[in-house]
A protein has these predicted regions:
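Acetyl-CoA-dependent GNAT
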Residues: 35-91, 101, 107, 160-163
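C-terminal "cap" of GNAT-fold acetyltransferases
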Residues: 114-117, 121-128, 137, 141-171
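A short, well-structured alpha-helix characteristic of acyl/acetyltransferase catalytic modules
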Residues: 1-35, 43, 161-171
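Active-site acidic-Proline motif in GNAT/NAT acetyltransferases
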Residues: 88-90, 94, 122-123
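Hydrophobic packing within well-folded, soluble alpha/beta domains
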Residues: 17, 104, 113-116, 131, ...
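Conserved acetyl-CoA-binding loop-helix of GNAT-fold acetyltransferases
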Residues: 93-107, 129-133
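Amphipathic alpha-helical recognition patches that constitute DNA-binding helices
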Residues: 16, 81, 99, 115, ...
């Protein structure tokens, strides 16, 4: 069984971001921006994540191997947006993203966060199924008319974190 945990992001993780942000197959499922990203741009974006102290950013670890990134960002009206990327493709389809999301939800609940949402590309069916397994519900399609790379997303919400943090669950 593969064990999953989250750890705080650190400077050495920039190499993972550089790799994942340049992977066209991965980008088609996430941002949709397929243009090449320079080392300077990677560094700029990564430093913004690394230095951000108000949001939660973690690396997803599976059996001591870094396989992805997950975040929780405060938005309006006590809502928090989550995003996850399992960047290492050999770990796709194994339920590890779902495990990471459940761990993040537990951390959120411990910190009093009860309203979480995400936006996902409608074509990313594997991700949508994972989010539904974690308790997210489809709410609406969101049009992004000014974003040529991501014209539409599907908003999914988890209004009340219902996972019992005291219950031992096999993760």
């Amino acid at each position: 069984m593969i064990k999953v945990h989250l750890r705080k992001i650190k400077l050495a993780d920039i190499n993972y971001f550089a790799k994942w942000w340049r992977d066209k197959e991965l980008l088609k499922l996430t941002s949709g921006i397929l243009k090449f990203i320079s080392d300077q741009e990677v560094d700029k974006y990564f430093q913004a994540i690394l230095n951000n102290k108000k949001d939660y950013n973690f690396m997803v670890i599976a059996n001591r191997k870094t396989i992805g990134h997950i975040s929780l960002v405060k938005r309006q009206n006590n809502w928090h947006e989550t995003q996850i990327v399992i960047g290492e493709k050999k770990y796709w389809g194994k339920g590890l993203g779902s495990k990471a999301i459940k761990i993040l939800i537990k951390k959120a609940k411990k910190n009093g966060i009860t309203k979480i949402y995400l936006e996902v590309r409608p074509i990313n069916l594997r991700a949508i199924m994972a989010y539904e397994q974690c308790g997210f519900k489809k709410v609406k399609r969101v049009k992004h008319r000014k974003n040529k790379y991501l014209p539409e997303t599907l908003r999914m919400e988890l209004k009340t974190c219902t996972i019992d943090i005291n219950k031992k669950t096999p993760l």
